[in-house]
Amino acid sequence: MRIFRPWRLRCPALHLPSLSVFSLRWKLPSLTTDETMCKSVTTDEWKKVFYEKMEEAKPADSWDLIIDPNLKHNVLSPGWKQYLELHASGRFHCSWCWHTWQSPYVVILFHMFLDRAQRAGSVRMRVFKQLCYECGTARLDESSMLEENIEGLVDNLITSLREQCYGERGGQYRIHVASRQDNRRHRGEFCEACQEGIVHWKPSEKLLEEEATTYTFSRAPSPTKSQDQTGSGWNFCSIPWCLFWATVLLLIIYLQFSFRSSV
């Protein structure tokens, strides 16, 4: 006689969908780290321009450009040299509230090292970021710098590199359009370079006049727009405005339903 054992019955397996299918997740925009921010600063454009110009300036040596978000000002390993670009121009884009602004106070730090025996050199680079003064978060947009501006900055880097690493007379440094007088107040509390104690340098009027006769600037400020309108304005796509329009829409729908029910 066979004994019936109910626990040995084999039921077909039930494949339940994972909870993630039914769960609603509110995903906040992730804050970008220093490494992500620095990698987004048109890394390919920087390397392309740097390699082309170094191949022309020093074809016998091999140079490499590395983005290093942990680079520190005046903290150098033995044999390394430093160049600090204090008056670069860049456009910032906030990934949280979509606010964009142009800044003439972008600071770029370079550390350089040349191994004469191996005929190889290395450049480490860090672009200091600025925080959005509307919501407090920011990242440097991939299209933050024009290719013409990058070429001018690389020219200054190579000039300093030839002076410090090769002992040559590099030539004259290029002054960019961002070095001109700007009446907008620079907010040091939102500037990463200012927070680390780097003092921004602004050239004298004489240097600006000399540079204006020898260098054609790629982009000039529009005369129709005031300087206060250039860096700020009404951002109707920001989160506060989105909440405002959503509230207005819900209020209109509520009034329509209440009016129909009363009729």
Curated annotation (Swiss-Prot):
Key word Cell division present: no
Assigned GO CC terms: cell surface; plasma membrane
Top-level division of the source organism's lineage: Eukaryota
Keyword Disulfide bond: no
Membrane topology qualifier: Single-pass type III membrane protein
Residue spans, topological domain Extracellular: 260-263
Start-end of 3CxxC-type zinc fingers: 88-197
Location of this chain's protein in the cell: Cell membrane
Main location: membrane
GO process annotations (BP): detection of chemical stimulus involved in sensory perception of bitter taste; protein insertion into membrane; protein targeting to membrane
Sequence similarity: Belongs to the TMEM7 family.
Complexes and interactors: Interacts with olfactory receptors.
Record protein name field: Receptor-transporting protein 1
Organism encoding this protein: Homo sapiens (Human)
Taxonomic classification: Eukaryota, Metazoa, Chordata, Craniata, Vertebrata
